[in-house]
């Protein structure tokens, strides 16, 4: 087991921060046509990222000084496809949430072999391991049964998009999850369906897929961190691979993070999760990740 100490100087994460998304990898074992991560540009399974090794992630993440109540959220892609995820979970000193589709390689035995599950033990108004069901890609009954096996020692639940095309399927999932004693929640569908726009957007014209304003000031309370350790201003920058606009790298000894307005020339290519009105990490409604000033 590696030491949780780091040789890098500490980095204070601004108090206003609501979320740190750690993209261990952009690889995924599913191929969903509706993947929100490929909203404007292909991000999933694009071979353009060097992935940090487990030892690098441990060094980088342990230097962070997080605001009270804010965990690290491992995501992707599929975070369990990173070969070092089990080593990371054993050695990172912070609480950790995981967004996963629960690939077949993730088993009860692998979790039981971990030297600690302390990373999973935090007070939270929602499951800290959030398993997503992807319609057309896997069997929700088998997924629920696997989650049920993990529930005795993990804070874990099932999530699915509340898509208007198949409310009957969502109700079936809800009933089966309740029958099996598994927590099931839906997430708001983002986008347009049969001429109707779903979700509430603070900036309704922000997600059209092309820049429509070249001089806005944007401040984000979310830090998306790419597989190579680069910290991006927003999800649009990450998915668009705008490395030249990154705020820095987690392994940079001189890294400093500031919560401030920054110039942006890409308004109109925003990702819905950054501009929608939603709940914050305390599940308080009315929060939006970004605040944008227009000239």
What role is predicted for each listed range?
Residues 128-248, 252-255:
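Radical SAM enzyme [4Fe-4S]-AdoMet core and its adjacent flexible, acidic
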Residues 19, 39-52, 67-82, 93-109, ...:
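Core AdoMet radical
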Residues 25, 29, 215, 267:
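Residues immediately within or flanking Cys/His clusters that coordinate Zn2+
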Residues 31, 41-44, 81-83, 106-107, ...:
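Short catalytic/ligand-binding loop motif for oxyanion handling, primarily in non-cytosolic enzymes
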Residues 43, 52-63, 87, 175, ...:
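Ankyrin repeat (ANK) tandem alpha-helical domains that serve as protein-protein interaction scaffolds
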